Design a protein with these regions (language model features):
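Catalytic active-site module of serine/aspartate enzymes centered on a nucleophile-bearing elbow/loop
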Residues: 113-165
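Alpha/beta-hydrolase-fold enzymes
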Residues: 1-50
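Conserved loop-alpha-helix segment in the C-terminal half of the alpha/beta-hydrolase fold
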Residues: 77, 85-121
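Short, glycine/serine-rich, charged loops/turns that create anion-binding
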Residues: 83-85, 126
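Active-site nucleophile elbow and catalytic-triad environment of alpha/beta-hydrolase enzymes
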Residues: 47-69
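Short amphipathic alpha-helices and their capping/turn segments at secondary-structure boundaries
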Residues: 11-12, 63-73, 108-112
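Conserved active-site and cofactor/substrate-binding residues in soluble primary-metabolism enzymes
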Residues: 50, 54, 101-104, 139
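Short beta-strand/loop motif that positions the catalytic acidic residue
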Residues: 72, 78-80
């Protein structure tokens, strides 16, 4: 598939392979459609953007790099939902889970980001973890604060030692 996709992307990178859907994940976010947040729908449409061959090709290339291992060189925190849910036309089914990505794939490949990765599944979190319902969002901020409390003193200590050397 990757060879075919690469070839197609060279000649038809703007070809649309999936059009925006009615409703979708955005309805679980935007306040006019049952969500909690107000944002510019031109920047993040409810049904997403058209998916093009070039976009899928770029994603696939990035995934292949990830599968080989990246090591981003810095500690990283990966917060994700604890489960995947189906994307539906209404927001109710997407309130408590990731309706965009397969979280089992995130769990499988997160360790390839670098040697200092912390992966934390957040119960009932949405795809955009910090846009989740209040309870999982509070858990996510708590985990972020704990991670920063753990990491920042180490980073400051290393910086100070490096400057003194």
């Amino acid at each position: 598939m990757s060879g075919t996709l690469r070839a197609l992307a060279r000649f038809r990178k703007l070809a649309v392979i999936r059009r925006p859907t009615e409703g979708g994940y955005g309805t679980s976010l935007h306040r006019d459609h049952g969500g909690e947040f107000d944002y510019n729908l031109d920047w993040k449409p409810l049904g997403g953007f058209p998916v093009t061959v070039g976009w899928i090709n770029a994603i696939r290339r990035g995934q292949l790099q990830l599968h080989r291992g990246l090591d981003v060189g810095v500690p990283n925190l990966i917060l994700r939902s604890d489960h995947t849910v189906a994307e539906t036309a209404t927001s109710v089914g997407m309130e408590r889970g990731d309706a965009v990505l397969d979280v089992s794939q995130i769990a499988r490949w997160a360790g390839c980001v670098g040697s200092r990765s912390t992966v934390i599944p957040v119960t009932d979190a949405k795809h955009d973890v910090f846009l989740s319902l209040p309870a999982p969002r509070a858990v996510a901020f708590g985990e972020l604060n704990r991670w920063l409390d753990w990491y920042l003193p180490q980073a400051v200590s290393r910086t100070t030692q490096h400057e003194q050397a």
